[in-house]
Amino acid sequence: MDENKQRALAAALGQIEKQFGKGSIMRLGDTQTLDIESISTGSLSLDVALGIGGLPMGRIVEIFGPESSGKTTLTLSVIACAQAAGKTCAFIDAEHALDPIYAAKLGVNVDDLLVSQPDTGEQALEICDALVRSGAVDVIIVDSVAALTPKAEIEGEMGDSHVGLQARLMSQALRKLTANIKNANCLVVFINQIRMKIGVMFGNPETTTGGNALKFYSSVRLDIRRIGAIKEGDEVVGNETRVKVVKNKVAPPFRQAEFQILYGAGISKESELIDLGVKHKLLDKSGAWYSYNGDKIGQGKANSMKFLQENTTISAELEGKLRELLLSHAAATDAERAGAEREDNAAADDENF
């Protein structure tokens, strides 16, 4: 760029910062904008799949999946982790189905949790906007988009047609919310349901409710599915769960995580620690015995999980080592990939020149 253009650009940037405030425009390389604060999901493998150690603050996240796949359990786990870090959380229960006893079992401090059960979709989103603009709430869960019923639909007759009302409501609300969420550094998670598109012959017939706006405004979209049952004898005690990161604006997308959700207990952290510990050689497995730092911790996975539950110091130490190892490895892999892409692009530019 020649000298005159550089001076003109510097003057324009100075004018923008004077008018709209410092940080309103910047070069991407000037600051560590991608060092985004995150909140753990309660699942180590999902935190690693997300690339930054959890869900990003100051962003919109969508979690969708079939019924009984673990959507609400995952969001309650996020709330428990956020509260443990001293953050304030709110739960907008549009489905009117929040179970405080189950939430408490998952580690949520229900006494400090802000809960709203709005009558209409407009009311729910206005409450969400007010909480965001307060700057005092760090995590807001909206359960669910499908239950955000427009006021006109509630006041109308059963058979009335209300085409596109919910989609328009979501589009308008997200336009207002996005900038406020960024400025307040608040995490807003929308839970969504799956519907089937009629007449789809090829491709995926599944879609989510509430139109397309949420797909665009979300920085992270998680597809959660139940892939199997966990049994003790003939009794089913939990679900094997898979989460796919179908969209990610803060790290590479399309990574997957698998973990167990136990009924009445939530995400099984100990099961993940054992599986990942063995995989990355922090735990030794000899026959049925598991060992950590040369000391046997249990015979069989169930006994080893019980040991980690009872010995929280060892559990926290193992989790810290795994988190450091896996997240630094993910960051290094991303950096290598980005460097390779830059080299390829430079080579292509040279050839074109």
UniProtKB/Swiss-Prot annotation:
Q: What is its main location?
A: cytoplasm
Q: Where is this region: Disordered?
A: 334-353
What is one cellular component GO term in this UniProt entry?
Answer: cytosol
The name on file for this protein is Protein RecA
- In its UniProt entry, the species of origin is given as Edwardsiella ictaluri (strain 93-146)
Q: Name one GO biological process term.
A: DNA repair
Example of a GO MF term: ATP hydrolysis activity
- Location of the protein in the cell: Cytoplasm
Q: Which SMART domains match?
A: AAA
The family assignment reads:
Belongs to the RecA family.
Binding residues annotated for ATP, in chain numbering: 65-72
Q: Which UniProt keywords apply?
A: ATP-binding, Cytoplasm, DNA damage, DNA recombination, DNA repair, DNA-binding, Nucleotide-binding, SOS response
Q: Where is the composition biased (Basic and acidic residues)?
A: 334-345
The entry's function note states: Can catalyze the hydrolysis of ATP in the presence of single-stranded DNA, the ATP-dependent uptake of single-stranded DNA by duplex DNA, and the ATP-dependent hybridization of homologous single-stranded DNAs. It interacts with LexA causing its activation and leading to its autocatalytic cleavage.
User: What InterPro entries does this protein map onto?
Assistant: AAA+_ATPase, DNA_recomb/repair_RecA, DNA_recomb/repair_RecA_CS, P-loop_NTPase, RecA-like_C, RecA-like_N, RecA_ATP-bd, RecA_C_sf
